[in-house]
Amino acid sequence: GFDHIALCVGAGGPTVLDIPNGLARGVRAASDFLMALQLTGAAKADSIANMQVRLPIVVVGGGLTAIDTATESLAYYPIQVEKFLKRYEALVAEHSREAVERSWSQEERAIAEEFLSHAYAIRSERDDAATEGRPVRIVPLLQSWGGATIAYRRLLVDSPSYTLNHEEVEKALEEGIWFGEGLTPL
């Protein structure tokens, strides 16, 4: 299953998809997602703003907004989980693990454990890269947790993003997004 789906179905005049659960938690219009990410400052490491994103991410659409949404999601995810870990560790140091986790619901606990696990893995990769004198490899971790996939109903070469700016699409693919061809939401 997927935890987040971004609907990128027309920036100028968005297409409303007639699909079940189109307004369920975790489903957002891409323009709303991108504006919230930028305007809240959630992507800034020193910001206390929070915008929860979980992996895997599916972006429905084939335009440049879909490309931006997928790449911004992948870029934001490590920041989000590392901020969560930093806050968690500070609260545990001040209060205790039991006190911090006492009021968590079952769902909150599952999400927290996921975020902490991913943040520890990212921290470990950063430490290993520094020790070994190599670049940090976060993208393979993100992909192993589900990554971000653009679901488009046609072929990549037929997508508006590719016909308008294939260089941006190529760069996004290099940054770790996946492009699913011939996919239509039910």
Which residues does each PLM region occupy?
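A structured beta-alpha segment of the ubiquitous adenosine-cofactor-binding alpha/beta core
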Residues: 1, 46-49, 182-186
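Flexible, charged surface loops at secondary-structure boundaries
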Residues: 1, 51-53, 143
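Glycine-/small-residue-rich beta->alpha transition segments that form the dinucleotide
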Residues: 2-4, 8-16, 27, 31-34, ...
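Dinucleotide-binding/catalytic capping subdomain of oxidoreductase cores
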Residues: 20, 24-26, 30, 57, ...
